[in-house]
Amino acid sequence: MLAALERQHRDLSIVLARLERARRDLVPPPATFWRGTARHAYDAALDGLARTVDAGVAAVRASRDHTQAAIARVVSHAG
């Protein structure tokens, strides 16, 4: 069981790092070249994308953290 949890933690850490890089690469900073309705639509689309990616990052981070807590519990009960 401990080996499976450690493998899961490692895999989640890899996925988290990839998602954090994707967040930086996919979601550009606010742009000033749009005006009016186009600017509003662009900003809304970016906000939606950022929220979606941030939710994914948070979910994977929470899973990794819960896995770390499970590892600690297994280790404490084994000793």
PLM regions and their residue ranges:
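N-terminal secretion-targeting helices of virulence/extracellular proteins
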Residues: M1-G79
